[in-house]
């Protein structure tokens, strides 16, 4: 199944044109961040935009993309089981509050400090464990929730 997925900045949710909304299957909202191991999102007026988008296209899926270039906190959050659980629980609270369809992880990049962020040699393994914990947490909440990730081409 082919899906058209687009990133939309949080501030632009209230300004999307009808034709753009109708052209998409999934919106990845850019970006939630990680603070003290928890997912946080500066979502001023986001509920209004999400409601308007769903009025135009009720089947459209909307997920919060967490991270982006230079977004720190993944390595620390993913390092322990407790940290992964805290991360996943905080992501779920945002999903519930805003009626989202899942979470996208945009960690650039596990195991490297290229973007000026903290890294650790265990990041690649912990990244997989973080995704698994997020999947488990969202599945326990509701079936069919999205867990997606942005990955590099190398």
Predicted regions and their residues:
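Structural motif corresponding to the C-terminal cap of alpha-helices
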Residues: 95-99, 138
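Glycine-rich tight-turn/loop motif centered on a GG-T
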Residues: 116-125
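Aromatic-lined carbohydrate-recognition surfaces of secreted/lumenal glycan-active proteins
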Residues: 3-9, 124-154
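Glycan-recognition patch characteristic of GH18 chitinases/ENGases
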Residues: 1-95, 112, 122, 133
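Mobile, glycine-rich extracellular loop/lid and propeptide segments
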Residues: 103-110
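Outer-envelope exported proteins of Gram-negative bacteria
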Residues: 65, 104, 148-150
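Residue-level recognition of the N-termini of beta-strands and the immediately preceding loop/turn
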Residues: 60, 101-103, 145-147
């Amino acid at each position: 199944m082919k899906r058209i997925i687009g990133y939309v900045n949080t501030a632009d949710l209230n300004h999307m044109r009808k034709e753009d909304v109708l052209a998409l299957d999934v919106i990845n909202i850019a970006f939630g961040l990680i603070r003290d191991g928890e997912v946080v999102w500066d979502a001023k007026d986001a509920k209004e935009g999400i409601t308007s988008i769903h009025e135009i296209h009720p089947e459209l899926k909307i997920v919060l993309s967490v991270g982006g270039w230079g977004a720190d906190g993944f390595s620390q959050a993913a390092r322990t089981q407790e940290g992964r659980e805290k991360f996943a629980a905080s992501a779920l609270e945002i999903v519930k509050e805003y009626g989202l369809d899942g979470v996208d992880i945009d960690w650039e990049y596990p195991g490297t400090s290229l973007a000026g962020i903290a890294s650790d040699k265990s990041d690649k393994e912990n990244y997989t464990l973080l995704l698994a914990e997020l999947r488990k947490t969202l599945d326990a909440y509701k079936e069919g929730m999205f867990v997606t990730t942005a990955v590099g081409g190398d």
